[in-house]
């Protein structure tokens, strides 16, 4: 069964729209227009044009074969466009932004009639370009890369003559830092909206849809939850390109729905441990919002080669419903490392409770260079020592067995403030560690050790190195947005990171931390469980 992409409700806004008539050689485009709602998924690939993946082959094959996926309650199919940009473009608009230079931009669009209440479709994610993304989400803090779900108002443009599919003329412009451009990290000048003008194939060969508008997704972060579930594609693309050699490449299932959500992820814990604790106290104005952004990156190994990383982005939103004075919202972040030679003793369930503003996950491309962290001056992360050594970690998946094999896990927690919060400088809270992941053969109760991957070996040459894990992310009662570790009862005040210089963060007692632990042996999160 093909993954499904659903839009939970029709577009409720009329955006600024500029219909544009394109003119080709020997073809004059004059037509009438009618307004339609367009759910558009803009996918920006890596800025390095040399980075290519087999997914492009299938992407093109879908176009060449003129295949259309079934779209329920809709009268149009899925179109695509690709354009190589030789130089960077930029503009400044509103609060969503993407910058692209010297790479490929792919824009996919699902068009439905405006009178429909909603749209559900069964699509090949490769045709949507989801598996074609380089580092839209997975490269933590990489400026200029983004995967953004947009809602657009489009217009049908009926052409006078039949024409072939035209490349997209995108204007995905501006700088992007995963929404942290309002945190005083030097990205404020690059704030801009994602503005796209795309030629979208209509139901007839002589009809295209010109789309130009502003995305509305970022303005209302509590409307959608987008969740990834991995699967293995069961078909190649033909012509010797793409998935013939990489049938293990992950598929992506994207589910869009408003939800009171819960995210459960399995991680491993053993005896030796190290600890990171951070706490940031921020002030919110009335009707403001506090967003704790949890970014988890996993490098996935295929049979004998790198299959590509998986990026997971979760925004957890807590609104301030009313306050005469700015409300102090506490964000506590605890990270803990566990290592031991031997068997992994247990799994810790990590739960995120509360209203989830957005969770975006996407399968990324195979190039290991996509894991390079961008500007260390803007976002403080720990260098990835695993990238210099090609290790094999088998059948251990700290993100709930989304995919078969992983190499490393990186966790970054960012705390940011919404648009209407009290304007003041706040330092980003970033807790990140990179470590080898357990080399194990199974993850069913007891874990059999497969091989040594690093460090001193035991008598039998067996060793397990477990990736440093991260905290549960959860919203406590009241107006506190709390993140606490499932296996740690102690928060050390001396390790507390503060939101701004001179602001003394309140110490967190052991009793406070003891209320947040959660231990679970449940399986990976599903779209249905999160939707609940």
Curated annotation (Swiss-Prot):
GO terms for biological process: carotenoid biosynthetic process. Belongs to the carotenoid/retinoid oxidoreductase family. It is an enzyme of class 1 (oxidoreductase). Its EC number is 1.3.99.-. Its cofactor is NAD(+); NADP(+); FAD. Residues 497-532 are annotated as: Disordered. Residues 509-519 have a biased composition (Polar residues). The gene is crtI. The keyword Oxidoreductase applies. It comes from the Bacteria. Pathway: Carotenoid biosynthesis; lycopene biosynthesis. FAD binds at residues 22-49. This is Phytoene dehydrogenase. Transmembrane segments: none annotated. It comes from Synechocystis sp. (strain PCC 6714). Keywords: Carotenoid biosynthesis, FAD, Flavoprotein, NAD, Oxidoreductase. GO terms for molecular function: oxidoreductase activity.
